[in-house]
Amino acid sequence: MQITRIPTTDPAEMDGPVQESTALLREGVSTEYEDKTVRSSEVTFRPGERTKFHTHEGVQVLYVTEGTGVVATREEEQDVSEGDLILFSPGEEHWHGNTDDADA
């Protein structure tokens, strides 16, 4: 078992190469597990915000803690809401973001 304490930080606007907008990012942790780097962050997408199509070297796990959103690949688009867990495979081109209703 490995436990990592996540520091409490204030969210800050992020503006990276995969962003269509400036979502709010609360940095989480980056740790090593079985020779792999595992990262976590809390991201809040304001109404209408989303990422551009992008990929990751490893699996990306999204967990919707509140609100509604949209996740998409080149082949499909799905609505998601509080309690949904989404997995993207390594190299799978995708985007994710919010609907136009409220923060998510």
Go through the PLM ranges and name each one.
Residues 74-91:
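Short acidic-glycine-tyrosine-enriched beta hairpin
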Residues 26-27, 39-56, 90:
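Conserved short histidine dyad/triad with adjacent acidic residue
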Residues 1-37:
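A short, N-terminal "cap"/entry segment at the start of jelly-roll beta-barrel domains
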Residues 40, 61, 87-88, 101-104:
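A short hydrophobic beta-strand segment most commonly corresponding to one strand
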Residues 97-99:
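Asparagine-centered strand-capping/turn motif at beta-strand->loop junctions
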Residues 42-46, 55-73:
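Short, conserved beta-strand element in jelly-roll/cupin
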